Amino acid sequence: MLMPKRVKHRKVQRGRMKGKATRGNFIAYGDFAIQATECAWITSNQIEAARIAINRYVKRGGKLWIKIFPDKPVTQKPAETRMGSGKGSPEYWVAVVKPGRVLFEMSDVTEEQAREAFRLASHKLPIKTKFVTRKDFEEMGGEANEG
């Protein structure tokens, strides 16, 4: 399960997710990727489940890059606890994802294999995603090797 080794602040505020992703929205390493089309918190368990689904489908072939990292702690109070008495303890970690963010990248597989692997992975994620290729970014005129 992904989580930071150490953090500056143990508890953080929730914040809000406005606008589109300005970083991590291009394919940097692979040839194929899935891109978020809506905003959400993605937990480390969901990232791991998607990674396992991709690796099961492509077996030993292909190389996978996980482009998001859960660096935000989410706190919870114990069940049946009265209001007040401070903020709860950190329970799990999430990655804040905005529309346009590239979640996973893949190379050394055919487009059909990548499309199916990412379809299986997208069922494990709480957001809608779209399949993109390096060619899509080159046609838009954007730099595909940002990052």
UniProtKB/Swiss-Prot annotation:
Superkingdom of the organism of origin: Bacteria
SUPFAM superfamilies for the chain: Ribosomal protein L16p/L10e (SSF54686)
One Pfam family named in its UniProt record: Ribosomal_L16
InterPro entries per the UniProt record, alphabetical: Ribosomal_uL16, Ribosomal_uL16_bact-type, Ribosomal_uL16_CS, Ribosomal_uL16_dom, Ribosomal_uL16_sf
Protein's UniProt keywords contain Ribosomal protein: yes
Molecular function as annotated in GO: rRNA binding; structural constituent of ribosome; tRNA binding
PROSITE patterns noted in UniProt: RIBOSOMAL_L16_1, RIBOSOMAL_L16_2
GO biological process terms on file: translation
CDD domains assigned to the protein according to its UniProt record, in alphabetical order: Ribosomal_L16_L10e
One GO CC annotation: cytosolic large ribosomal subunit
Keyword entries, A-Z: Ribonucleoprotein, Ribosomal protein, RNA-binding, rRNA-binding, tRNA-binding
Record flagged with keyword tRNA-binding: yes
Function, in words: Binds 23S rRNA and is also seen to make contacts with the A and possibly P site tRNAs.
Annotated NCBIfam families: rplP_bact
Oligomeric and partner information: Part of the 50S ribosomal subunit.
Family that this chain belongs to: Belongs to the universal ribosomal protein uL16 family.
Name of the protein in its database record: Large ribosomal subunit protein uL16
